[in-house]
């Protein structure tokens, strides 16, 4: 019992550290469809430019396998150690959450709000960042246990929409 409590406290401390780093660094660079040959030199260039948060996306088109994404997450995580936090993006399934965790991801970013994905992310001790568009979806994401919510898709909404959502 005491061992489990200590383990839970360690998981919470690790998650709190990831949250504080996301709040501190704010910018998450997104890696999508980058070859294994280019991923580390691209990550190093971003790191040298001050980026400390990187997201490797799962390819839902089937062009790149889940294992390919896991390999890239693992390459970045092992190369940079604690100097950089890598997460997985475009995560749609609980299986992808587990694959990302095993590869070294510290946070999960999804384009949607899926209660099962959020729950699995929290069970794995990772930070959950689902996507949501409406105030109802945003509230639902938080109710499911999301640590942050990504406004998605946001490209055509404008600052007025964001201000309106934040107003209440």
Question: Can you describe what each PLM-predicted range is?
Answer:
Residues 2-86, 91-103, 123:
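Conserved N-terminal beta1-alpha1 strand-loop-helix module at the mouth
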Residues 68, 83, 95, 101-168:
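Conserved anion-binding
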């Amino acid at each position: 019992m005491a061992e489990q409590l200590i383990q839970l406290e360690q998981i919470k401390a690790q998650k709190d550290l990831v949250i504080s780093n996301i709040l501190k660094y704010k910018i998450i660079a997104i890696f999508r469809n980058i070859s294994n040959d280019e991923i580390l030199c691209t990550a190093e260039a971003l790191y040298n430019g001050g980026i400390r948060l990187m997201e490797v996306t799962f390819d839902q088109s089937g062009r790149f396998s889940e294992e390919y994404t896991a390999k890239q997450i693992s390459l970045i995580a092992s190369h940079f150690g604690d100097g950089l936090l890598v997460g997985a993006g475009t995560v749609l399934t609980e299986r992808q959450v587990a694959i990302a965790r095993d590869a070294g991801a510290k946070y999960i970013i999804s384009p949607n709000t899926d209660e099962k994905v959020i729950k699995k992310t929290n069970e794995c001790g990772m930070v959950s960042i689902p996507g949501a568009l409406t105030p109802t979806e945003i509230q639902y994401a938080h109710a499911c246990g999301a640590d942050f919510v990504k406004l998605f898709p946001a490209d055509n909404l404008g600052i007025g929409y964001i201000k309106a959502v934040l107003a209440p």
